[in-house]
Amino acid sequence: MAIFRKRFDLKVSVYSRSSCLVALGLALPAVTSAVEFNAEFLNNEGGAPVELKYFENGNSVSPGTYSVDIHLNQIMIRREDVVFSADPDTGSVRPIIRMGLLKEIGVDIARLTRDKLIPANLENNTPLNVAELIPGASVEFDVNSLSLLVSIPQLYVQRHSRGYVDPSLWDDGVTALFSNYQANFTRNTNFGQNSDYRYLGLRNGFNLFGWRLRNDSSLSGGTGMRNKFSSNRTYVERDIRALKGTLSLGELYTSAQGDAFESVRMRGVQLQSDIGMLPDNEISYTPVVRGIAETNATVEVSQNGFVIYSTNVPPGAFEITDIYPSGSNGDLEIKIIEADGRQRSFKQSYSYLPVMTRKGNLRYGLAAGEYHNDGQPSVNLLQGSAVYGLSDRVTGFGGLLAAKKYNATNLGLGFNTPLGGLSADVTHSQSRTRRGGRNQGQSLRLLYSKTINATETSFTVVGYRYSTEGYRTLSQHIDDMSDESYLYGSSSSRQKSRIDLTVNQTLFRRSSLYLTAGETTYWNRPGSSRRVQFGFSSGIKRASYSLAVSRTQETGSFGRSDTQFTASVSIPLGGSARSSQVYANAVSSQHGDSSLNTGISGYLDEANAFNYSAQANYSKDGGNSGSVGLGWDTSKAKLSANYSQGRDNKQINLGASGSVVVHPGGVTFGQPVGETFGLVEVPEVGGVGLDGYSSVRTDGRGYAVLPYMQPYRYNWVNLDTNTLGSDTEISDSTQMAVPTRGAVVAKRFSAESGRRVQFVLSMESGGKIPFGAQAYDKEERVVGMVDNLSRLLVLWDANKDSSVQIKYHPYK
């Protein structure tokens, strides 16, 4: 079945119930220059004449409007309808490039005006001959991919960071009310006695004019329990584009930039930066590479042996600011390849910590409200924090926190050094207790990360914190103020020191070692908590296996320790991605506890909509047990059922999760949705699939919920054209969306359904319609092409009393 993406500006119209008028034009394949063809070669006896004037003029399309992919300097920018018109003198068909289109795709209009290449103050709809006005520019049309290829010298292109998305494309979505639900029912049978448990978790939302109202709540109950409804939190938020941030009001969790303070629950207002609005290379710390080129040179930047960036630079000093490293650590190798073939290389250290950001980048957070946690006193609080890139290698951060009888100040610096990424900060707190006492102290934190390329050793995070006895976090201060603490003393453990270490070592292909270790000590209790885990993982062909040992130790008055050994293996039973997997996992501890789990899991259909699992377990204390499970992913929900049985107990678990979306077009059921999601409409066409979501289909009214979209980034919504029936045609199977955070973005795809009807055409004079003539409807869309016997096959949703009128407009 053909999928059409063209819309033509011809004088045509269609009338249902009375008549249908179809205009016939001619559109023929492209040639690169004017050529004359002998039409007799294509004629057969009794067949229609062939009109080849478009071939002879070298055109690839006929005049009209086309939905095309617009590329600027080989980078896909957007999809848009572009008008193609014919020159009345030459007959050449060319795209009309508007002034507004050049602005939208990132051409530097101000510089073009300053260099007097275009007049000032042109209207957005003013057509421009780009190739003639801008030296070195060109506009080409690739009919095979329906792509408009615009080439502009880099001097006249606005410079944006990698991953930049024009904020004018941000879409707040449609007005929508939705609920994301998770329902579970569990029945346990122990020694013949049944007990049930029911749970319904809801994440509700309402979107209106860019505002997002959200509520998290749940309903639970069961045997011997009263049904209980609880609302965890309710809040409203919206983005503040000018500040590249989000404003939130209601029941919130504070967010301190640079992790200056702990996150606490409050009722109030919060304004904080949203890094999702930033380009990719501004989200995290990115290095700036500087050097000097002697000629027109190529600069390559490599990390861990892979080229991650390449660009051409003119002679002289250069500065590269849009590098996006492939990992958080690993020195960069910069190679300068001169025009005469000479090469020079040097290395630049790069280690990244989450607190670090690029030069000039500011992240901020402001919060004001009332501390709110069940069972604890409520106090007013005010908090502010910020992270700022001071230079290419130094980031500064800090914050202030004030509450009733409490205040804290944080200040720190992050460094990118040849020895690795390092940050240090100190927090000073002052608080008063309910008994009138005064606490004052400091907490020092050090973080370090480094990758040694020569040995492929990565110190992912090495952290150390030390707090003096008088230091308090806000939650510890609130605990000191509580009635229970006033009567019996504080029950919370106040941390004195903590050290954490994570090391990863690559050995060879698919094999690696890891080590994690840590120790924590406390002021108000003796002893310490220690934890160490060491592991090895590898694979043989498609099978994978791992070994690990873990030890925990609590020292002091109630000291205890335990060491566990684990081994696991997973083997696929086939070569495809949907092949079933056989797995086994064994665990043993120093106290004699041991268990063995073996099982199989996989899918039952090609679309991976039905999944299954079966498992057999052995436990030294619990004996033998087994379980089976089934899952079914539908367009409207995800369903699951599991049954397990042990020596003395049985359990049945049923689950369902999904979403209900109320929108201007009605009510649509879908799979569980994320923070930002989409709504796809193919009017009145059911069963249409979406690429990337094998189990999602449009319902009978043509709606489907697209479960996940990435905010502030290009999201391509693609219909699975293989799921369209032979009686359905769609003009464009791909659309682009850039949702704001929390938006419900609606995308409508124009589709036509009907029966295939064949017309045998002839002129009043008795002559045939030329072979290759195209037919257009009143929507200016291609509906068919005349064959060599003057027949036209179209998709037509006709009524009983409908008729069709056809006018032929030969190309001149």
Language-model features, listed with the residues they occupy:
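Post-signal-peptide, soluble extracytosolic/periplasmic N-terminal scaffold domains
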Residues: 2-4, 10-16, 21-25, 32-283, ...
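Short, ordered, surface-exposed loop/turn motifs in non-cytosolic proteins
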Residues: 62-84, 684-693, 765-779
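A short, amphipathic beta-strand motif
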Residues: 70, 289-291, 678-683, 755-764
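Short, acidic Ser/Thr/Gly-rich low-complexity loop/linker segments typical of extracellular
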Residues: 83, 694-703, 780-791
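Short Pro-Gly-centered beta-turn/loop motif in secreted/extracellular proteins
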Residues: 88-97, 323-329, 703-725, 729, ...
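Extracellular beta-sheet/turn segments enriched in Thr/Pro/Gly and aliphatic residues
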Residues: 147-151, 354-357, 670, 732-754, ...
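Transmembrane beta-strands of outer-membrane beta-barrel pores
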Residues: 156, 185-189, 210, 219-223, ...
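Feature captures outer-membrane beta-barrel proteins of Gram-negative bacteria and organelles
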Residues: 168-172, 196-209, 229-242, 378-392, ...
